[in-house]
Swiss-Prot record:
Subunit-structure text: F-type ATPases have 2 components, CF(1) - the catalytic core - and CF(0) - the membrane proton channel. CF(1) has five subunits: alpha(3), beta(3), gamma(1), delta(1), epsilon(1). CF(0) has three main subunits: a(1), b(2) and c(9-12). The alpha and beta chains form an alternating ring which encloses part of the gamma chain. CF(1) is attached to CF(0) by a central stalk formed by the gamma and epsilon chains, while a peripheral stalk is formed by the delta and b chains.
UniProt-recorded name of the protein: ATP synthase subunit alpha
Organism: Mesoplasma florum (strain ATCC 33453 / NBRC 100688 / NCTC 11704 / L1)
Required for activity, annotated site positions: 362
MF terms (GO), sorted A to Z: ADP binding; ATP binding; proton-transporting ATP synthase activity, rotational mechanism
Keyword annotations from UniProtKB, A to Z: ATP synthesis, ATP-binding, Cell membrane, CF(1), Hydrogen ion transport, Ion transport, Membrane, Nucleotide-binding, Translocase, Transport
Chief place of localization: membrane
Length: 525
């Protein structure tokens, strides 16, 4: 075939005409290995830790391992679209999430992208998901209560705004229920909520979102979901995305509540990524920096002073234990990072005591300074009385001959436990809690048969919301937020009246079973 000189010269002439002087500089490397959501890339010598990389087909990755001659990256999309030899480019950016009020009421993925079919999120502002926690001098002490609406928690394990309180227990003990009830109770309290789901079933999250909508909680809540079907890198990123969304509000002077459900699955996702990146395994095959994984996340919860916005982030991380073993690696790590823990017991849960809070190992290290006086004044002995009850109950199983004092302690303890039982999705306000705790403290519940205690608790709330004199006393307590002698005697008299009224409706009621008949006849007079 003869060469056509004219055609060749036309091609060369065309190329000279179209020659551009603009030089596009891009640092790029090539994929050496790819598999299980992790890639090893050669040629990106200047890549930074946490930097975003772009692969073919618009798939992004994040640098998590820097080695001599190669970098390890986790893939944030479908890694099956990437093959060996593909060109990878640096972006010079880190993972960011949209932030702002446009996130309220939305369900987003671990990258802050909407997954609720309600259209795009209309916000121009975004922030890097990884950042250093607020410094010591920017922080303020925890002194304002965060009301959970759960009597057992608000009374004996109080939580303050800016605190980190761990919810820990075996599977199916009501950990998520405690967190969801706390979110529902923030309605009308000017607290924005973020629920971060890590490794949960999508059907479970759909139910949670439906419940939040039903109780009007989605009006102030954002849900960040990295489900069980999502990759380990997305499950790893989800909590950092959640707290970044919350930090924007905190810096604008608002109070935020964030729930991480749960950090056990978060640690498992990080372990999976680390092992695939060939990092040396440590205890329980977790990498050596698994403590830092959670500490840098939970340290971002704080109450900041006015110079830095004056807002707060309160964190409720959830940890799932195996056979109630709180001495395992991840539980002990998170216990040491947080400001206290709420321990949920499977034995109590199976016995129908819900929320199944085991008061013994549960503690709030900073929350007591945030408790309102009305609750603090009447809840001081509650933990001690329950501790005495559990101790005596264990011994009472060995012998039937018990003295009157021991019997009284056991009877009172059993009634306290029934008073603390609370149905899900029915949070209490703090004044109702204070009145219920006063009824416990003044031992007026001793006249009520054990099987009727829960009904009596409901009656207390109804009585103080409807009866004229009782309603006036409740209004005064709401105004003052602390007890005085007049309030104590007035409310005691009203509860005594209620005891007489309530017991009169019970069939075959005999007050002598519970105490002296003369003492009973003096009630309410």
């Amino acid at each position: 075939m003869a060469l056509n000189i004219k055609e060749i010269s036309e091609v060369i002439e065309k190329q000279i005409k179209n020659y551009g002087k603009d030089i596009i500089e891009a640092e790029q490397g090539s994929v050496v290995t790819i598999g299980d959501g992790v890639s090893l890339i050669y040629g990106l010598d200047k890549a930074l830790m946490g930097e975003l990389l772009i692969f073919p087909n618009d798939v992004y990755g994040m640098v998590l391992s820097l080695e001599e001659g190669a970098v390890g990256a986790v893939i944030l999309g479908d890694y099956k679209l990437i093959k060996e030899g593909d060109i990878v480019k640096r972006t010079g950016k880190v993972v960011e999430t949209p932030v702002g009020d446009a996130m309220i009421g939305r369900v987003v993925n671990a990258l802050g992208q909407p997954i609720d079919n309600n259209g795009p999120i209309k916000t121009k502002k975004s922030k890097p998901v990884e950042r250093i926690a607020t410094g010591v001098m920017a922080r303020k002490s925890v002194s304002q209560p965060l009301e959970t609406g759960i009597l057992g928690i608000d009374a004996s394990i109080p939580i303050g705004k800016g605190q980190r309180e761990l919810i820990i227990g075996d599977r199916q003990t009501g950990k998520t229920a405690v967190a969801i009830d706390t979110i529902i109770n923030q309605k009308g309290k000017n607290v924005k909520c973020i629920y971060v789901s890590i490794g949960q079933k999508d059907s479970t999250i759909a139910q949670v979102v439906e419940k939040l909508k039903k109780f009007g909680a989605m009006e102030y809540t954002t849900v960040v979901n990295a489900g069980a079907s999502d990759s380990a890198p997305l499950q790893y990123l989800a909590p950092y995305t959640g707290v970044t969304i919350g930090e924007e509000w905190m810096e604008n002077g608002e109070d935020v509540l964030i729930v991480y459900d749960d950090l056990s699955k978060h640690a498992v996702a990080y372990r999976e990524m680390s092992l695939l990146l060939r990092r040396p395994p440590g205890r329980e095959a977790y990498p050596g920096d698994v403590f830092y994984l959670h500490s840098r996340l939970l340290e971002r919860a704080a109450r900041v002073n006015e110079k830095f916005g004056g807002g707060s982030i309160t964190a409720l991380p959830i940890i799932e234990t195996q056979a109630s073993d709180i001495s395992a690696y991840i539980p002990t790590n998170v216990i040491s990072i947080t400001d206290g823990q709420i321990f949920l017991s499977s034995d109590l849960f199976m016995a129908g005591i819900r929320p199944a809070i085991n008061i013994g190992p549960s503690v709030s290290r900073v929350g007591s300074s945030a408790q309102i006086k009305a609750v603090k004044q009447v809840s001081g002995t509650l933990k001690l009385e329950l501790a005495q009850y559990y101790e005596l109950e264990a011994f009472s199983k060995f012998g039937s001959d018990l003295d009157e004092s021991t019997k009284a302690t056991l009877d009172h303890g059993a009634r306290i436990i029934q008073m603390l039982v609370q149905r899900q999705y029915s949070p209490l306000n703090q004044i109702d809690e204070a009145i219920i705790l006063f009824a416990i403290k003044s031992h007026l519940i001793k006249w009520i048969p054990l099987e009727n205690i829960r009904d009596f608790k409901t009656e207390i709330i109804t009585f103080f919301n409807n009866e004229k004199d009782a309603k006036a006393l409740k209004a005064e307590l709401t105004k003052k937020l602390e007890w005085n002698a007049d309030l104590e005697s007035g409310i005691q008299k009203e509860i005594e009246k209620l005891v007489v009224k309530f017991t009169s409706t019970l069939k075959n009621y005999n007050p002598t079973i519970f105490g002296d008949e003369k003492e009973f006849k003096k009630l309410g007079k």
